[in-house]
Amino acid sequence: MEHNIGNNAELIEAKTIANDSFLPTANDWEKIQDAEQIIKKAKDLLDYFLDQYPEVKRIGLTGQMHGIVYVDKAGRCVSPLYTWQDGRGSLPEDNSISLVEEIQQKCQVKAASGYGMVTHIYNLRHYLIPDVAVGFCTIMDYFGMYLTGRKRALIHASNAAGFGFFDGRHMCFMKEELGKIGIQGKWLPEVCGAMQELGTYRNRIVTTAIGDNQASFFGAAGNENSTLLVNIGTGGQISVLSDQYFAEDGIEARPFWDGKYLLVGASLCGGKAYALLEEFFRKLIKQATGQDKPLYGILETMARKGKETNASRLENRKLKVTTTFNGTRANPETSGSITNLFADNFTPEAFTYGVLEGMVLELYQMYQIIRTGTYIQVTRMIGSGNGLRKNPVLCEIIEEIFGIKLILAEYEEEAATGAAISSTLLKSIERTK
């Protein structure tokens, strides 16, 4: 819940509830969630705030990007949520190459597994789409439909771009390229570049949903150029706001608003690398002692010691960890690695520090690509995500590697904050329904 005061936003109340919506599946690569359960929880949360704060006039929306749900002609959800983590696009097809590779070869378009359009193409080929489905959208766009009674999705360009096959320069889907791989335009949702009104819910205006990346940036850093946002949670991401459109291997130009772009680099593992390390040590402790307790406090102590010890070593004697344990968006088959192992650095402290450093270096390499290609001079660096808030050593490593002071975002729920403020960007109350 945000209260807008001039150009500032004051956080009145934040509320977090468990998602717990993943559906069991026989396929390790399949990551799907119960869409209706998500919608019910979101509605209950919204109703709570509207009951508590009846003065609310507008409702802004955001949610997880890239994933899709299918809807029927009445605007009802008829499928699970296929999430951004879904791996069907990386599976070998009959021609022994993955769908992602085929898209690159046939369409010269780079799209990762988990992107909505990749998921849709796979589902279409494998007859996995419900017969009554007439289109698809993100889960937050469906929530907007649910609240306002819309029968057809209207999605902001920030979400459309997350599907893949989207021309960020001209703010439209690449219909010619989609045609090369057999996708008809009838499946595509309507796209808008500016905030629009979807309709109303309980007499409040509901605005178009925005991507969680854009919402997080807006909530944490505002809309100033030359600002770098570093987010580390289960994943890892850097975002720089720019007037320039710039896209390279591993770097996306995601639509923002007012003609700006978020230049984004994302690591697939990110904070998960640290979680894997904690899980590794926890299994060892459980095997030795029978105890199964979180070890993040101990890891922080070891990371601190590892950092101090590492500072006194020669560069060629420092243990190095590459944390691409889940591959990269550009190359899903890339593996992680541990190098520069010597007898004197074969320690849990060095491993712990090495994982944290590896997480940061992967993001820093992406930042270097952006800086070299755009000549952007970053003057402010904002940090967000629990991976940073709960790990002072990681924050120090980021400052040292990037060479910029790190300021933690004022509010923890950056995406929700940005979504709430985004509703104030609506310039017209004309119905788009």
Describe each region flagged by the PLM.
Residues 29, 51-83, 109-114, 144-168, ...:
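Short beta-strand-loop/turn "lid" adjacent to the catalytic site in phosphate-handling enzymes
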Residues 1-79, 105, 132, 179, ...:
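N-terminal glycine/serine-rich phosphate-binding loop of ATP-dependent small-molecule kinases
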Residues 90, 95-110, 118-152, 164-175, ...:
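Active-site core segments that coordinate phosphate-bearing ligands/cofactors
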